[in-house]
Amino acid sequence: MTVTIYDVAREARVSMATVSRVVNGNQNVKPETRDKVNEVIKKLNYRPNAVARGLASKRTTTVGVIIPDISNVYYSQLARGLEDIATMYKYHSIISNSDNDPSKEKEIFNNLLSKQVDGIIFLGGTISEEIKDLINKSSVPVVVSGTNGKDEGISSVNIDFESAAKEITEHLIEKGAKSFAFVGGDYSKKAQEDVLVGLKDVLVQHELELDEQLIFNGNETYKDGLRAFESLATAKPDAILSISDEQAIGLVHAAQDAGVNVPNDLQIVSFNNTRLVEMVRPQLSSVIQPLYDIGAVGMRLLTKYMNEEDIDEPNVILPHRIEYRGTTK
């Protein structure tokens, strides 16, 4: 039988309001009364209902987390960072997988609101117009981590993908690359746009250009990397920038199967630097994103909104660096 707040109050011989104050950490309770109530809570193994507490205090100490693909290593590392900070600030997370489906995201978003969450955090993915509208009308604060929400007026944490793309392109040109291709994905459209801007800007400076036929869009998976190479192979690019590690590994394997030497004939760079980059030979050159920090800082930003703290910068850009390994010269 479920133990209720009424049972605790009766056993401790106090009012239900007093039990509620103890459970919610209200300091306006005598120490001896607090100790007595806590003893009864422990004795009866009472577990407060978060939603019921939320109705009284207008807070449930829960946050909703929406992830495009929880099985993706990139998003799991973001999730670890946010979960640690949520725990530090005594929040519980409700994690939901959206499959990058706007209709499913909308359903999850509304479901989280119905659960009285105190805030919502999106991990990566693309912010659709429908979701942007929901965020702007939301009764609770929302932060996105792993994508840039500045243009949409949404608080966010990310790296500067445009700057990273410029650095990579300059390096590859220095190493002899003249023909470039780009492999993107549906999960990271904003990052993809920024990478293409940086790539094209540097190519123009060197009197080169990116053939639109050498832009491949997929779902950021290993199989998409295989398909991308098949699509791009006849053009024989010198270098490929890939938005995800899984895609890039597919590119490496497809190139090797076709007898193309990586990196002598084809240089490949990815943008995630998950643990997968060291599991392929040659090891994958990649942009090192502070994935754990992106998730952690996103959650900390959300806690500031939920606790009505001062916000110095609603759109945080964290530093990145590039690790050139075996897939580049």
Swiss-Prot record:
What is a GO molecular function of this protein?
Answer: transcription cis-regulatory region binding
Name this protein carries in UniProt:
Catabolite control protein A
Q: Where is the HTH lacI-type domain?
A: 1-57
**DNA-binding residue intervals:** 5-24
Q: Which domain of life is it from?
A: Bacteria
> What PROSITE patterns does the entry give?
HTH_LACI_1 (PS00356), HTH_LACI_2 (PS50932)
Which species does the entry assign this protein to?
Staphylococcus xylosus
Keyword Transcription regulation present in the record's keywords: the answer is: yes
Going by the UniProt record, its keywords in alphabetical order are: Activator, DNA-binding, Repressor, Transcription, Transcription regulation
Pfam families membership? LacI (PF00356), Peripla_BP_3 (PF13377)
Function, in words: Global transcriptional regulator of carbon catabolite repression (CCR) and carbon catabolite activation (CCA), which ensures optimal energy usage under diverse conditions.
